[in-house]
Each structure stands twice: as C-alpha cells, then as structure tokens.
Amino acid sequence: MSSRILTSDVIGIDALLHDHHAVLAKSTGGAVAVFANNAPAFYAVTPARMAELLALEEKLSRPGSDVALDAQFYEEPEAAPVAIPCGKFAMYPAWQPDADFQRQAALWGVALREPVTAEELAAFIAYWQAEGKVFHHIQWQQKLARSVQISRSSNGGMPQRDINSVSEPDNHIPPGFRG
C-alpha cells in the first residue's frame, strides 16, 4: 500500500511513547510522522503548529471577497415540459415515452417487469437519431418497448448490468470445507 508522508521527520511509535516531548521539540516543522509496523499510523503535532494550522484553516474558510452574487444567478429555471410533436417526427435527444409506458407496453404484448432505464433510453435515442427515420409518437414507443424486450431477453428479462461495476467475492465457506 502506497502512502504519502507530509513531513520529513519520521519516528516509530515506541520512540514517541518513550519521550514525546523531546521528539516533538526536535522536529523541524512542529510535526512528526509516527510509524507503526513500518506503515504511517498518525501525525504528532506540537501545540504551536496546531494553532498555526487551525488559524490557516480558519483564514482559508473565509471568503476571499465580500462580493455576493444575487440568488438569481444560482437558480436554474425549470424546464418546460416538452410537447409531443404532432404527426410523424424524427427522433430527438429530449424524447421521452409516456408516463404510463409500462402499461401501454403490456397492452402491446411486451411485458416489462422494470421501467426503462436511462441507459436503455439513451441507447435507443442515439440509434434512431442516427437512422433519421420518422414515426408517430406511439410508433416510437412501440419500437422502444420491442427494443427493450429484445435487449433484456438476453439477460433473463432484467436490465443489463453495469460493465464497470466490480463484483464482490463470496466469502462464505460451504459446510464440509475448511477455511
């Protein structure tokens, strides 16, 4: 395990316990890195150095300027709901299926146990944006339902797992085996 030592003065924990006043008095910056089992355990700091560090922290926590911005610069205006275009339209980035999409999909014969994930919707939109085809809103929803059904069928009907997640090992030892 790598670690970074923040002072050039290093001492073992046994030496610090033996005579901590002398160790801290000899330190150049008022701080000593204390090692236990050849690994940094903690830092020992003189009261004067601790006062300096606290004063520095307090100084840095104060704003550097007394200029305050109006609250209007921090508040984002609420996005107006996107109206569904009439007639046929090409897929666009902000397209969303209806709120009762799962129920509608069931009426079309596509039973979705879980709602459509943001990743599934993004992949669908990206694919059909590139295609440039035009369909009615209801047709887009039917295509989304079928697309999600097909993509999930290869994974037992569940959304695909995140490929970046790290699996956790099973530490349980079955009966009859030694651990």
Swiss-Prot record:
Pfam families to which the protein is assigned, alphabetical: DnaT
CC per GO annotation: primosome complex
BP GO terms, sorted: DNA replication, synthesis of primer
InterPro entries the UniProt entry points to: DnaT, DnaT_DNA_bind
Keywords linked to the UniProt accession: DNA replication, DNA-binding, Primosome
Region (Disordered), start-end ranges: 151-179
Biased composition (Polar residues): 151-168
Gene3D superfamilies: 1.10.8.1180
Family, similarity comment: Belongs to the DnaT family.
Quaternary structure (record): Homooligomerizes. Interacts with PriB. Component of the replication restart primosome. Primosome assembly occurs via a 'hand-off' mechanism. PriA binds to replication forks, subsequently PriB then DnaT bind; DnaT then displaces ssDNA to generate the helicase loading substrate.
Function: Involved in the restart of stalled replication forks, which reloads the replicative helicase on sites other than the origin of replication. Can function in multiple replication restart pathways. Displaces ssDNA from a PriB-ssDNA complex. Probably forms a spiral filament on ssDNA.
Name under which the protein is recorded: Replication restart protein DnaT
